[in-house]
Amino acid sequence: MPSVRVKENEPFEVAMRRFKRSIEKTGLLTELRAREFYEKPTTERKRKKAAAVKRHYKRLRSQMLPPKLY
């Protein structure tokens, strides 16, 4: 669990921003949203496979040479 110690004479907003940043770095919020509802194992596998395919095509697209415009 991320924790933030409020420094002396530090505004609350700054401490809150540091806390939000630390939670974002650990990935706690994304995991919480993923675990909010039960996901069947088949659905989870299907979603992960679709994400892998999307990443693969994105990587291929970035490696392709741009078309010549002349």
Swiss-Prot record:
GO molecular function: structural constituent of ribosome
GO annotation, cellular component aspect: ribonucleoprotein complex; ribosome
Keyword line: Ribonucleoprotein, Ribosomal protein
Single GO BP term: translation
Pfam families documented for this protein: Ribosomal_S21 (PF01165)
PANTHER family: MITOCHONDRIAL 28S RIBOSOMAL PROTEIN S21, SMALL RIBOSOMAL SUBUNIT PROTEIN BS21
HAMAP family named in the record: Ribosomal_bS21 (MF_00358)
NCBIfam families: S21p
Family to which this protein belongs: Belongs to the bacterial ribosomal protein bS21 family.
Name used for this protein in its record: Small ribosomal subunit protein bS21
Gene source species: Laribacter hongkongensis (strain HLHK9)
Gene: rpsU
